[in-house]
Design a protein with these regions (language model features):
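Short glycine-rich phosphate-binding loop at a beta-alpha junction
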Residues: 1-5
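Flexible beta->alpha loop and helix N-cap segments adjacent to enzyme active/binding sites
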Residues: 9-265
Length: 265
């Protein structure tokens, strides 16, 4: 386990992973100053409870979250500009929209602790064709065309697609995609065939897992393109109002907030 600023150096993490010097590496996803408070809290907990056994924290969805009433209050505020429906299975509906080629804003549960969007404050699309990468960079994120996106993959399929020997739940290991899988996920593969992989485990993020799993049932590809819910120069969307305003202003086709699905009028 290691952290601080070096912890977000994906290619260094990938080299350490590939070296096989360790059975497993763990990088705290809020590496840097933000993680100091988290680390001191753990040290205090260990000292005060006399905990002997090492433990690993796997849930880093520690930020703000909103209940259905709070979400609906925001929806009603913008009802002249949006249509919204309550979906019994938002993950299944979202997967179908993505498979049809739509760009989806995905705002769920508690916000991520750290700089990466890990499936609760994300913009999501299908990982193919290659032109999807260019479209999202140019029309949604307003970034340079070479900038890569992350493949979010069902954890049990990760070794089929990537040269990974462990989970990568916090999108902090750069690894290569296998040659026979590149054609299925070209929008998430960097020019050097590397990927910033996020493995998704149902026990950690059930709704995001269900979205990808439903996408897999439709397309037979267990991977979606995942990028942070923001545009260049802006912070990640933190509350429903932020998400709705971003959705209305930019080329995002649909927005899922909790179990509500939004479309522009």
């Amino acid at each position: 386990m290691y952290c601080w600023g070096c912890g977000v150096k994906l290619y260094i993490n990938g080299k350490i992973h590939d070296s096989k010097l360790f059975k497993k590496i763990f990088v705290q996803p809020a590496s840097g100053d933000a993680g100091i408070a988290y680390g001191t809290a753990i040290v205090s907990f260990i000292k005060n409870t006399k905990l002997k056994k090492n433990f690993e924290s796997r849930n880093f969805y520690l930020g703000s979250k909103f209940n259905p009433n709070e979400i609906k209050k925001s929806l009603l505020k913008y009802r002249k500009k949006i249509h919204f429906t309550f979906e019994k299975d938002i993950a299944k509906k979202a997967a179908k929209l993505i498979s049809d080629g739509n760009i989806l804003g995905w705002f769920q549960g508690a916000a991520e602790f750290g700089p990466r969007a890990l499936g609760n404050r994300s913009i999501i699309s299908k990982p193919f064709p290659f032109s999807m990468k260019n479209y999202v960079n140019k029309n949604v994120k307003f970034r340079e065309p070479f900038r890569p996106f992350a493949p979010a993959v069902l954890e049990n399929f990760a070794k089929d697609y990537f040269y990974l020997t462990q989970e990568s739940q916090h999108m902090l290991i750069a690894t290569k995609v296998k040659n026979n899988k590149k054609k299925f996920i070209p929008a998430t593969v960097h020019v050097d065939s590397s990927c910033r992989v996020q493995t998704v485990n149902r026990n950690i993020n059930a709704k995001f897992f269900d979205l990808i799993n439903n996408f897999y049932k439709i397309t037979k590809i267990p991977v979606v393109l995942n990028t942070s819910f923001n545009v260049k120069g802006q912070p990640i969307m933190n509350d429903p109002d932020d998400a709705i305003l971003c959705f209305l202003k930019y080329k995002i086709d649909y927005l899922a907030i909790g179990d509500f699905l939004l479309k522009k009028k």
